[in-house]
């Protein structure tokens, strides 16, 4: 009997102690293993902490809440797609509990146990050097040797470089051979109190029949000054280009100077969906050359100033190479061109939603499927029909968002692009289905393990039509559908090989239901092959 009473006393004492005990993360250390012992680089601790910071200010009311936070943080590490998923570990150590003078709701002293986190992971393979053939119905067949490093020098920044030869085909809109090389990489570093980013982008190409190559070289600096609830971002870039398309204006060689300033402000913490950010910003762009930009060259008319603000939040979780999550961005900006005297107020809404589902308990085939939706809408707040310049020259290109709709379409008998409207609603729907996974174990074959998905898709766009002067008339819309095959390499988790075939189903199958008078007679199908997802 005495033992039972003693046990009950100890149990109640421990319960009271734990009830008043809370937890707070005090420090974090990272142990990131390189891809191999011979590798000289691994993911930098500072870049991880910057990309997904650990909350060291939050006090967790229970051990259960702490564990939920750690599980969520592990998922965020997976979402980086930078590490071998099975190697991600989060271990922890408790300090001796510290009793504070603060009382909880029950009038008991608040006891805090400080927690030290030990995060361990191994870098996934992130360097890809492969032939990257790409077929696009708009430009033709591109034979490419592509270098892509999604975690170059351990900075969590992507380096892209390629050498290509573009060959026109009977299906393509291009007529001449083209060869070129491209390089782009932004290098992060600390500059005093600033988080800095050195911006670099270079491209040079030669098209048969031209006397000179075309090129564009851009470099700049981005500085971030972080505060508790906001940060100031300054960015300045300069580029030098040779564009033979401006030869008739004697503006072939020209410079572009840009300056941007923004200040993302955290309005609220939306828990799973992260921070709700409000971002006011200001941009300026100025084109110039040594003999002055030709006044008739509308494409280089400047200076242009833009002021705006945006609201955004979002998160997407990866599981079995499928996504679950939601992201929303609402943007409103006002742009003025001092050369053309054109004022352009614009509102944009971009929304992406993903959901994955489990199918059969079989790791080899048909174990999951997903639903993906991408909704982009925008509108100029001025009436295009009242301004001939806006009608002829203004708009936002949407061709790249529509698989199956040729990018180079013009209103019949005009030089106006049918895919650069001033208002549009674009919807992409994808339904990826897991088809096959391989699990080879031999030394060489294990590097070829992959997951394969097939994804039917539907792309729809309703726009302001510059010929009929109507908004979002379904008869003036673009309707496409098709199929994508997507391959994810297990050892290169951040790389997706995607092949797509799309058909302009509106023009091909339902021409009697559409306004055909203004439509250009281009091909009704579009193919593409590349190394990234559509969205």
Regions picked out by a protein language model, each given a short descriptive name:
Residues 4-14:
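Sec-dependent N-terminal signal peptides
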Residues 126-129, 152-160, 190-199, 226-235, ...:
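Repeated loop/turn-to-beta-strand initiation elements of outer-membrane beta-barrel proteins
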């Amino acid at each position: 009997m005495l033992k039972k009473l003693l046990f009950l006393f100890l149990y109640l004492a421990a319960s009271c102690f734990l009830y008043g005990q809370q937890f707070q993360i005090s420090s974090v250390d990272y142990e990131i293993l390189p891809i191999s012992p011979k590798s000289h680089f691994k993911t930098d601790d500072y870049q991880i902490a910057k990309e997904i910071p650990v909350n060291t200010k939050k006090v967790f009311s229970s051990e259960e809440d702490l564990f939920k936070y750690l599980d969520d943080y592990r998922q965020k590490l997976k979402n980086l797609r930078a590490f071998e998923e099975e190697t991600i570990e989060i271990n922890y150590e408790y300090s001796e509990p510290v009793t504070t003078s603060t009382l909880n709701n029950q009038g008991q002293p608040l006891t805090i146990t400080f927690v030290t986190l030990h995060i361990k992971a191994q870098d996934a393979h992130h360097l890809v050097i492969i032939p990257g053939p790409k077929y696009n119905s708009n430009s033709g067949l591109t034979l490419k040797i592509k270098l892509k490093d999604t975690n170059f020098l351990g900075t969590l920044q992507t380096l892209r470089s390629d050498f290509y030869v573009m060959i026109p085909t009977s299906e393509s809109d291009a007529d001449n051979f083209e060869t070129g090389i491209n390089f782009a990489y932004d290098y992060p570093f600390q500059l005093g109190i600033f988080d800095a980013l050195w911006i670099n982008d270079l491209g040079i190409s030669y098209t048969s029949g031209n006397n000179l190559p075309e090129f564009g070289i851009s470099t700049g600096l981005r500085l971030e000054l972080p505060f508790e609830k906001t940060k100031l971002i300054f960015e300045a870039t300069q580029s030098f280009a040779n564009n033979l398309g401006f030869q008739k204006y004697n503006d072939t060689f020209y410079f572009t100077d840009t300056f941007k300033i923004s200040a993302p402000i955290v309005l609220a913490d939306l828990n799973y969906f992260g921070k709700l950010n409000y971002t006011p910003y200001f941009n300026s762009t100025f084109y110039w050359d040594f003999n002055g930009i030709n006044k008739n060259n509308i494409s280089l008319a400047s200076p242009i100033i833009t002021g705006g603000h945006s609201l955004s939040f979002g998160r997407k979780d990866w599981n079995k190479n499928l996504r679950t999550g939601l992201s929303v961005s609402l943007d409103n900006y006002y742009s003025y061109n001092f050369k053309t005297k054109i004022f352009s107020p614009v509102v944009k809404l971009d929304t992406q939603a993903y959901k994955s589902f489990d199918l059969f308990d079989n790791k080899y085939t048909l174990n999951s499927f997903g639903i993906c939706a991408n909704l982009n809408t925008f509108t100029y707040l001025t009436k295009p029909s009242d301004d001939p310049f806006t009608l002829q020259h203004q708009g936002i290109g949407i061709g790249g968002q529509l698989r199956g709709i040729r990018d180079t379409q013009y209103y019949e008998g005009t030089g106006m692009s049918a895919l650069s409207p001033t208002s549009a609603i674009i919807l992409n729907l994808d339904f990826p289905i897991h088809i096959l996974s391989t699990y080879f174990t031999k030394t060489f074959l294990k590097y070829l393990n992959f997951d394969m998905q097939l994804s039917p898709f539907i792309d729809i766009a309703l726009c302001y039509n510059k010929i009929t002067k109507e908004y979002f008339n379904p008869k003036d819309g673009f309707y496409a559908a098709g199929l994508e095959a997507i391959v994810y390499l297990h050892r290169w988790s951040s790389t997706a090989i995607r092949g797509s075939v799309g058909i302009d189903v509106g023009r091909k199958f339902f021409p009697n239901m559409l306004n055909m008078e203004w439509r250009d007679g281009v091909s009704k199908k579009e193919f593409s092959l590349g190394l990234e997802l559509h969205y």
